[in-house]
Amino acid sequence: MSEVLDLSAEARERAGKGASRAIRREGRVPAVIYGEKQEPASIHVEEKVLMKLLHTGHFFNSVVMLDVGGKKVRTLPKDVQFHPVTDRPLHVDFLRIGEHTKVNVNVPVHFKDEELSPGLKRGGVLNVVIHDLGLSVDAAEIPEEIVISLKGLEVGESIHLSQVALPKGASAQDHEDITIATIVAPSALKSAEGEEAAEAGEEAAEG
């Protein structure tokens, strides 16, 4: 299960661009808490602490417990706006949730048992189609990752959504049996990349 992240916050008295710029100059990031049929709450958080949480790699599929003036608020991060040049966070949206609220999250997909794949042993290449899997899951049971075994996979074989073991109580947001990954021959991969490059060249020539 993904760990619960803690983040201190302070209520934001003033709104507007001028107030937000002033907050950022103090090393803080404006944010808002919304949802659960309650009024949105304007807050701000420390930029350095927020950056540490963003660098965990699982910020968006973790419950974040906000401490707003001593009051604990259970939330799920929904969006972070970044500066286009400096890449510093400009604003954060937090969705207020209950302990067992059903939430939609994108969970990273990881693979194991590469050494047990005959296709990879013969020089095949793992072509990952889906890097994050959209799940609908209990907020208290959000997985940190979905691990998929490559055991027994030959060149030309694929892993589909229907073959992936999801955590108990979780369901995929995508109802189609999408392809997660495929073992391809190196020549097939190079051919596909060559075709894409050729198409890009043709489009550039036409444009």
Curated annotation (Swiss-Prot):
GO terms for biological process: translation. Pfam families: Ribosomal_L25p, Ribosomal_TL5_C. It comes from the Bacteria. GO terms for molecular function: 5S rRNA binding; structural constituent of ribosome. Keywords: Ribonucleoprotein, Ribosomal protein, RNA-binding, rRNA-binding. GO terms for cellular component: cytosolic large ribosomal subunit. Belongs to the bacterial ribosomal protein bL25 family. CTC subfamily. This is one of the proteins that binds to the 5S RNA in the ribosome where it forms part of the central protuberance. Part of the 50S ribosomal subunit; part of the 5S rRNA/L5/L18/L25 subcomplex. Contacts the 5S rRNA. Binds to the 5S rRNA independently of L5 and L18. NCBIfam families: bL25_bact_ctc (TIGR00731), PRK05618.1-2 (NF004128), PRK05943.1 (NF004612). This is Large ribosomal subunit protein bL25.
